[in-house]
Amino acid sequence: GLSLSFAPK
């Protein structure tokens, strides 16, 4: 869901 939208890389 939206979690990956702000997940650090």
Curated annotation (Swiss-Prot):
Q: Name it.
A: Unknown protein 1
Q: Which organism is it from?
A: Ginkgo biloba (Ginkgo)
Q: Where is the organism placed in the taxonomic lineage, from the top? A: Eukaryota, Viridiplantae, Streptophyta, Embryophyta, Tracheophyta
